[in-house]
Amino acid sequence: MPHLPPLGLPARRRLAGALCALFATATAHAGGWETVSASRTYNTIPVESDDTVNPLRGYHRWQNQELVPQAAPALDAFRRYHWRDLESVQGQYTFGAILADLKAARDQGRKYAFRLRMMAGYDDGQLYAPAYLAGNASCLHGCGFWADSGAASGKTWVPDWNDPFVLARSRALLQALAQAIAASGNGASIAWIDVGLYGQYGEWAMRKSVYANRPAGIEEAGTDTRRAIAQMHFEAFPDQQFVMFIPYANRDALHYALLEQTITSKPVGLRADCLAQAGYFRQWTDHPDDWRQFADQWRKAPFVAEFCPFDSGQAGPATARAQASEFHISSVGNANFALSKPDNQRWLSLSEPEQHDMLMLGREAGYRYGVDSTWVSLTADGQLTLAATFRNSGNAPTYEPWKVRLEIVDAGGVARWSASVPVGLNSLAGGAVTTSVQSSWRVPALAAGSYALRLIARDTRPADGQQRHPLAWVLSERDADGGLTLLNLRSR
């Protein structure tokens, strides 16, 4: 603070001294900041009208389809592949379809999820495993058998899941795919991988009827086999996000994947293949002690799902919406319903209440991050303080490495200064939970002009073209890129 002249001096000398003092003050502040002390509150978009599209929440693109109307294309896409299309001759792999889909997702600003399958239909007479596998002499009992599982005229080829050769070739397939994806340079564009291969559609479920007349020596998949199939996925892709199918019969494999193994760098999530089927989750709620082991896995790894075809009664959108809410499901495939209709008629075939439930499911599933309030203080010499309260009004957290940044942005949109705000979005599990933080920084002098002070959540992964776009706050005041301008600053 400048020293003013003593009051006892003559008036002319006191005036001259005061002018000198004021000049000294202005000089001290030259190149500094205009002082600020401002508080502000923000408006969370009501869930009923929230059409925000964010990664790994709401609806994801399913088999190149997005049937429930959304405000923007999904930021995650999922597809599944038959083993026979990836390895027609033993040891000769054709991963072109997967690599092309993965690259397309990257080029479109999405991330990609997939599953490999050894079976894909009952009684259709199709062999979905490689032709070389059926009847291969390296297997103890022919690697599998043709079963008649129902009234349809065709038969179903059932692999001998326990056979060492079948397991070895499955492991080789996954290892070769991992190498091909690594060589493509697009591995960071994977959203998640289903632990697949085993079971019908690779979904870890089998009709017991197919084993009624099985050949001697062939048995249902044992617990060691199921663990081995999960393990080979993890060993091939140890740093990717996995999700695991939830049939109750696989509880031992789930225990291994979620609670025992230490191969994967990320916790393994859950996968439901029959959302909307009334009573589907009773397989777990009827066994509460068993479910208790996995019930909170959603807090640290994603729970994703796809629909069972809608039937009459309780099997439909209302049931799916309730299940997604109760079990904290983050992302649902945006297709695979009303299968009796052509693709362009499926959405229109739903009643108005059913359409409402489908829209609300997408709005409610997963995280909904916002900012309740902020207080900003900036001194002339660049001491910047932020106090902020963050909220997750969704039903689950994010599972990706977002970092909230405070940025000073010039008129051209270039961040001239930024700092990390000490808030972990992953720790805000949902249910309107909030957390408040306060931090201070010393901001350097910047060129004279006006700047925007912004809060933005950015993907912390390497900037190699595979980063997510900034997370969009669910706030009425948010900017076009999803960030939030708190106020304008002025450097002198």
List where the protein language model places each region:
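Bacterial N-terminal signal peptides that target proteins for export
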Residues: 3-16
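Substrate-binding cleft/loops of secretory-pathway carbohydrate-active enzymes
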Residues: 194-236, 243-298
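Extracellular/luminal regions of secreted and cell-surface proteins that mediate adhesion/ECM remodeling
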Residues: 359-492
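Boundary at the C-terminal end of the N-terminal hydrophobic targeting segment
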Residues: 28-30
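Active-site groove signature of glycoside hydrolases
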Residues: 144-166, 173-215
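N-terminal substrate-binding region of glycoside hydrolase catalytic domains
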Residues: 32-165, 293-349
